[in-house]
Amino acid sequence: GDVYKRQDWLRGLIEFFDLPMSNASRGAARQSNVVLTLGGNSAEAAIGICYEIAYGQSMRQRAQNAGVLMTLTNDTWFGRSIGPHQHMQIARVRAIENGRWLLRAANDGVTGVVDHQGRLRGQLPQFTQGVLVTEYQIMQGTTPYSALGDWPLLVMLLALCVGLGYRMGITGVA
């Protein structure tokens, strides 16, 4: 989450640090998934706090035993820029990569529910106070990304570099 050392020294000096709820307490480096229980059914939820959702590998590891992804965020930092909408798009990519529905709660950004194919199934607009009531599904199984991670991309990049190097060696031009 948003944890800044010595941020108390900066309050009043830098406007950025005067935002409400702009600092959280540091938690343990490794945390277990949260178990959601509703109507007698329960499932693990992989949690990403704020911008943690931007890190595919981290969310991939958390999602291994989870049936749903969740992210809680404070998008106040972005103001009225396109930042909150980009943040939501990043979260949608995590839903697709992991084949899991994503529940996203934002106190000043876009709150929404995204299905396992990245489709927005419900949302509250930015700067709107309200409650989003919608349905979601608990998912199981793996996707190519959840099984292999970034390795296929790295192998393709390596092959491209080797191919370009080989071509430069033969023709002297890339």
Regions found by a protein language model. Give the residues of each.
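Enzyme catalytic cores with a strong preference for nitrogen-chemistry domains
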Residues: 1-174
